[in-house]
Design a protein with these regions (language model features):
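Residues embedded in well-ordered beta-strands
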Residues: 113, 144, 230, 312, ...
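A short glycine-rich, aromatic-capped structural motif
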Residues: 101-168, 191-194, 308, 373
Length: 373
């Protein structure tokens, strides 16, 4: 493999080399003394001495974590929630329009769908500790939300120098940088929260509209589309193949080999070692990395890829629940919602949360924008 394959110095392992007959450990010390100002050491003795020192310390007892009491779930109910998909039309009946198309540059459009006002139970006791306790949250006003994540093309209309670059490829002997993530229709990635907010600011100035990132409450309300399940389309075990782009059986295609590496055959002796990425192996969504367009089904509000494809910045601080619109506590992190093509369902639910520094450019995080009236 043209690379060291041992985790230690193995003297005289290759008998055909010119230094055969020399004690390579002693020779190494001699040369280090000669060319590094007497820095040669008997490293085998050093290691043996340290091992003896550790042995004399006796048994090392681990420090066990404190026992955590079971979380008591508090069941909250909201009148009229959850609701069936066919109720969305009724909720938007008083709206003059439910779809808005903006031309943000010559020939470049961005489509928004109307998200109704409403109330729901935010968070879940079935997720990580940062997803509870749950709380009732009211979305007071309807708002517009991008039906898709902001694309490379849309982002480049304001920041033309940005390049989302590539998704890393395994193996070696590459002839390309990786899997493209910079196609015009793909969602933009490797943009920070600060970058996303600056994009919103400039786009607002150009259009005269109040364009920004959603709060995490707005995001979760929009993502759920009336559902109180883990996903808008069901629970953690639901088949997401036609619904969203998550870590599925297609992830096995990251296991590649050869010059200009191509997917390994399942018959390859290396296959079981290189298909190590965690995944929902019983689902096939047909996508290896993030995709553009409307390949998957929209949720009841008309939004695509809220659970996967790429995760999305919100404008909320990453603080403990219960959720508050204007928390007294502030955080140095901003909340990212949703999962991505490389994440399993349990990390991609409607209530999953992550926190990143506002200056971080993350390989699988993009954003979608909203318009507030």
């Amino acid at each position: 493999y043209n690379a060291p394959d041992k985790g230690y110095f193995n003297a005289n392992v290759l008998k055909s080399f010119p230094y055969q007959g020399y004690d390579q450990i002693e020779r190494r010390k001699q040369l280090t003394d000669k060319y590094a100002g007497g820095a040669g050491v008997d490293w085998k003795k050093e290691i043996a001495d340290y091992a003896a020192q550790l042995k004399n310390k006796g048994e090392i007892k681990p420090v066990m974590p404190k026992k955590v009491s079971p979380v008591k779930e508090k069941v909250l109910k909201v009148k009229g929630w959850p609701f069936a998909p066919d109720r969305v039309k009724e909720m938007l009946a008083d709206e003059k329009e439910t779809v808005k198309v903006l031309e943000i540059a010559p020939g470049v459009q961005m489509t928004f769908v109307r998200i109704p006002a409403g109330e729901f139970v935010m968070g879940s006791y079935h997720g990580e500790p940062d997803t509870y306790p749950t709380t009732k949250v009211k979305i007071d006003k309807a708002f517009w939300m991008g039906e898709l994540e902001v694309t490379n093309q849309q982002y480049n209309t304001i920041f033309p120098q940005h390049d989302s670059r590539y998704v890393d490829q395994q193996w070696k002997d590459h002839v390309v940088p990786g899997y493209p993530a910079n196609k015009p229709e793909q969602p933009v990635i490797r943009v920070s929260y600060n970058d996303a907010m600056e994009y919103c600011k400039i786009l607002s100035q150009k259009t005269g509209l109040n364009i920004t990132l959603p709060t995490e409450a707005q995001w979760e309300w929009a993502c759920r589309g009336g559902s109180d399940e883990d996903f808008w389309f069901g629970n953690l075990n639901a088949d997401f193949g036609k619904k969203d782009n998550l870590a599925d059986v297609t992830t096995n295609k990251f296991a590649v080999s050869g010059v200009d590496p191509q997917p390994m055959s399942p018959e390859s002796p290396w296959y079981k070692y290189y298909t190590f990425l965690p995944k929902a192996a019983n689902v096939d969504d047909g996508s290896l990395v993030q995709v553009g367009g409307k390949k998957y089904e929209a949720n009841p509000f008309g939004l695509y890829c809220m659970h996967g494809n790429v995760a999305e910045w919100t404008r909320s601080d990453y603080v403990p629940y219960p959720y508050k619109e204007n928390p007294k506590k502030v955080s140095e992190y901003k909340v990212v919602r949703g999962g991505s093509y490389i994440e399993r369902p349990k990390y991609s639910t409607a209530y999953s949360r992550k926190g990143f520094y506002p200056y971080q450019c993350v390989f699988n995080v993009g954003f979608r924008v909203i318009i507030e009236d």
